Regions:
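N-terminal intrinsically disordered/low-complexity leader segments
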Residues: 1, 33, 43-46
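…primarily DNA-binding HTH/wHTH and HhH modules…
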Residues: 1-5, 90-132
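Terminal helix-turn-helix DNA-binding modules in bacterial transcription factors
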Residues: 8-25, 44-80, 107-126
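Core residues of bacterial helix-turn-helix
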Residues: 31, 80-81
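Short coil turns linking two alpha-helices in DNA-binding domains
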Residues: 34-35, 83-84
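Short hydrophobic/aromatic patch on the recognition helix
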Residues: 38, 42, 87-88, 92
């Protein structure tokens, strides 16, 4: 259960810091596990690397922000830690399949990537008596 707690804590930390420049080492320090083991365990359980998860969540949230139409695309790019608008547009297009400017015209094209929730369900482990 210690691993599950660590993974949940890692997810919470990443979610709280989507608008901050964080690294896998920052996440590992937060949960007190070596970066190597955390990255390996996270990838095994979720199918994503730590930073792939962060990137996907940022790009999903960025699309939601663009739909609200309250901020300029360049400001959203910087908000989610992209160094240039071009790098943001490239990552956004790869993830969503459309450019940030096309989002309002075609909101159904946005790829959904909601926060991970880790739950464990253990079933079985008991014997059944034979009915006679």
């Amino acid at each position: 259960m210690e691993w599950i707690t660590a993974l949940k804590k890692a997810i919470d930390f990443m979610e709280a810091n989507l608008c901050n420049d964080i690294s896998a080492d920052d996440v590992a320090k937060e949960v007190c596990i070596s970066s190597f083991y955390l990255q390996k365990g996270f990838a095994i359980v979720t199918g994503f690397s730590l930073m792939e998860y962060v990137r996907n969540r940022r790009l999903y949230n960025a699309a939601q922000d663009i739909l609200k139409n309250e901020e300029k695309i360049i400001d959203i790019a910087y908000k989610y830690c992209y160094e240039t608008p071009e790098s943001f547009t490239k990552a956004f297009s790869r993830f969503h399949g459309i450019t940030p400017r096309e989002v309002c015209k075609n909101p159904s094209s946005i790829k959904t990537f909601v926060p991970l929730k880790i739950t464990i369900s253990i079933k079985g482990g008991f014997t059944m008596d034979k009915l006679e």
